[in-house]
Amino acid sequence: MKNKKTALGSVRKKRRKLQCIETFFQTNDLVTAKQMLSSIMQYAVNGKDWLKKDPSVILQFHQSLNLFIREGYMISKKKKKRKVNAASYIGSPMMKGSLSAKEYENPLLVFKRAFKEYSIQEFDYFISGIVYFSQQMYRYGPESNLVRPYIHLSKMLDAAYLMLERGIQKNDSKKVK
């Protein structure tokens, strides 16, 4: 008899740490991603005008943000197994971006806090909503609160970029009782 394992299951390779986030920042640098998110958010809340960018660019950004959110969720679940390398000297407060001092020291906290407050589905709903409302003029705007998910997503972008810069390692230290 033939082996009935699927090709995906039998050939599955170990994924590198932060591979989706690396890919996200290869296609969108941090500044561009935050500007795109900010402009989509502004047009979604405004309602009197729509974002006049190529819809394919916005759709690609929407899809890459969805993958980014899923990778962030996986990071938040593996928090105890990973540790971000120590921060170097902070030259100016602008280097921290939207992160607090504690979040700058440990960017994994950003993901833990974001997914403690919102689920993946709620982030998907938020991203889909702002993209939808930024693409058209409307009379009645979005129903839900858009500010909190936007702040979390902006912080996650900053934290993920820091994690890529510093590197991440497994936390092998065990607590002694």
Identify the residue ranges that each predicted region occupies.
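Sequence/structural signature of long amphipathic alpha-helices
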Residues: 1-177
